[in-house]
Amino acid sequence: MRDGDPNRRLQVTLGIQFDEAGDLPKLLKSYCVQNGQFAMQISPYLAKLNTGNDAATVLSPSQRFRDLLRNAGADPVMQRLQKEMFKATSWDPALRWAKARKFALPLSFLIVADSFLQSNQMLSRLTQRVRVALPVTSQADEKNWVTGYTKIRNAWLKAAGGAMAASSYRTECYLRLIARGDWDLTSDVVMNGNRIPLREA
């Protein structure tokens, strides 16, 4: 995929968070250090991660490397490391950002967390365009801010074109939840055709 790389070149991605231009090298180095099941096979590829030219990384055409990542995905060591890195790089910073601005609604936290997951931050060029003061002083202000931000982010993604525009299914999903008034996330989330249960049966 080209998504996530500043030069829009082809690169290897793992899951929804890890790519060669981002945290994939760090994840795989940690996996090898902790002697994951496929560490010995993956280790020789570490030096080649995020190398190449403006069109593609060296590893993007490697079916062998992609197969190794798929196999490693079933390893409990890899699963644990992914959860730990997601918590450290996306979830925890998102919670701090939202709480500092007095957000309290589950959907607000989800939307902020998704922004950190995709952009590693709440982009100031988007947040500064929302016409509601922060920190919010009421639940109504919170809803208005999050609604305005999500609409702005949705338009920004669509205008970007390519893989960024294709990722607007995320913001479209959140706008549907907002339109339904499901700020407490009482129902399943349907994103990009996939149903994600948020409550235990």
Identify the role of each PLM range:
Residues 93, 98-110, 116-126, 141, ...:
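Long, repeat-rich segments with strong aromatic
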Residues 28, 38-41, 96, 122-127, ...:
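Generic marker of "main functional regions" within proteins
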Residues 33, 86-96, 113-121, 131, ...:
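Sec-exported extracytoplasmic/periplasmic mature domains
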Residues 9-20, 122-145:
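Short secondary-structure subsegments characteristic of cysteine-rich extracellular domains
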Residues 131-201:
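Low-complexity, Gly/Ser/Thr/Pro-rich intrinsically disordered linker/tail segments
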Residues 1-111, 184, 191, 197-200:
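Acidic, aromatic-lined catalytic clefts of primarily extracellular/periplasmic carbohydrate-active enzymes
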